[in-house]
Every structure is written in C-alpha cells, then in structure tokens.
Amino acid sequence: MKIILLGAPGAGKGTQAQFIMNKFGIPQISTGDMLRAAIKAGTELGKQAKTLMDAGQLVPDDLIIALVQDRVAQPDCEKGFLLDGFPRTIPQADALKAAGIGIDYVLEFDVADEVIVERMSGRRVHPASGRSYHVVYNPPKVEGKDDVTGEDLIIRADDKPETVLDRLKVYHTTTRPLVDYYQAEAKAGNTRYFRLDGTQPVEAVSRELDKILA
C-alpha cells in the first residue's frame, strides 16, 4: 500500500497520516526527516546534501529521489509507505515514476483557502509545553491562557493570516498541478485517486479513509 497525500497546508493531512500509519502499520516517509537522518549518519548522499544546504542551495530532485529509493527499500516499507511532502512538483512526480516507485493511492484533502486561513490563524500555542488550542474548535478555559499553567498563549509566525496566505499561494502555484497530474495517472490505470472533503470532522474523514484503503 503505497500512498501519497495531497492537500494544502492546514488541510488535515498530518492528522490522517497518523491514522493511516496506526491502522495499517506503514511508515510515513518525510523527505525532511530523511535528509536529516542521512546527514547525521554521514552517508554519501547525506554528505552531498549537507554541502549544498550549507551553501544555502536547494537539494536537487535526483538526490531526493535517491534518498527515497534507499528509504523504500528498508524492511519496514515492505507493506507499503506514506509519502509526506513529496512529490511537491510535476518534475518530482515524473522522477518518482521514472525511478520505478509505483503509487497505489493518491488521496487529496480538499479544503477551501478561507477555511484553512480560519483554521490556522485560530491556533494558539503554549510555547513551553507545545500544548495547542484553537479559538473556535478547541478553546482554552480562559481566553489566551494555557489550561495547565495559566501562562500566555501565542500565535506562531507560521499561523499568522498573511503567512498562511503566502504558503497557500506557493501551494497553488507549485503543488496544486499534481492534482491534475495524478487524476490523469488514475485515468490511465496507474494509480487510484480519491478526493476527500477535509472540512468534515476528523473521525468522518478517518472512516472514509478506512473504507477506501480496506
């Protein structure tokens, strides 16, 4: 079961990735985690990536694909894997295909931009503990204060409306075209494509995923 999750930041991919991993026992593969692990382990690919990153350059697709190939060959990926944050662009999707890494399911979490802005800009965090709240969906007992310590909650820079809108702009320009790409792949019989309504309650989305992947 090889899965790609698509959807804008704040569409609920992280929550459902956790559900899929627990339910089906497959690992989540994050390219960021892989890069950090390869650099820490001092592998050949890790050394190349570190040199580029130290120079402030982006790690090229061929290097990332080589890391993904290494990772999916590990024993814990025998039953499948969940790709998170990759591919982000059509050239990356093409490279994945050229590397012979087939994908069984592409799952898109569809949420309107204004809902994402409301979701993310309503988040509040207690910096010391990492506890998070939401002014609408999961409010603290006292507005602006952590339930446990009574200390002030903050809005992370990432959750400010202007930052969220910038991230959405990047998503629509670079990653959104993958929706059409993978729908075409599904029509050609190369994968199965499902669009889920990410505005539903978390449990409802999980139930739908369970049916799709069962």
UniProtKB/Swiss-Prot annotation:
Its EC number is 2.7.4.3. One of its GO terms (cellular component) is cytoplasm. Residues 122-159 are annotated as: LID. ATP binds at residues 10-15, 123, 132-133, 200. The keyword Cytoplasm applies. The keyword Cytoplasm applies. GO terms for molecular function: adenylate kinase activity; ATP binding. GO terms for biological process: AMP salvage. It catalyses: AMP + ATP = 2 ADP. Keywords: ATP-binding, Cytoplasm, Kinase, Nucleotide biosynthesis, Nucleotide-binding, Transferase. InterPro entries: Adenyl_kin_sub, Adenylat/UMP-CMP_kin, Adenylat_kinase_CS, Adenylate_kinase_lid-dom, P-loop_NTPase. It comes from the Bacteria. AMP binds at residues 31, 36, 57-59, 85-88, 92, 156, 167. Pathway: Purine metabolism; AMP biosynthesis via salvage pathway; AMP from ADP: step 1/1. Catalyzes the reversible transfer of the terminal phosphate group between ATP and AMP. Plays an important role in cellular energy homeostasis and in adenine nucleotide metabolism. Monomer. PANTHER family: NUCLEOTIDE KINASE. Consists of three domains, a large central CORE domain and two small peripheral domains, NMPbind and LID, which undergo movements during catalysis. The LID domain closes over the site of phosphoryl transfer upon ATP binding. Assembling and dissambling the active center during each catalytic cycle provides an effective means to prevent ATP hydrolysis. Belongs to the adenylate kinase family. This is Adenylate kinase. The lineage of its organism: Bacteria, Pseudomonadati, Pseudomonadota, Gammaproteobacteria, Pasteurellales.
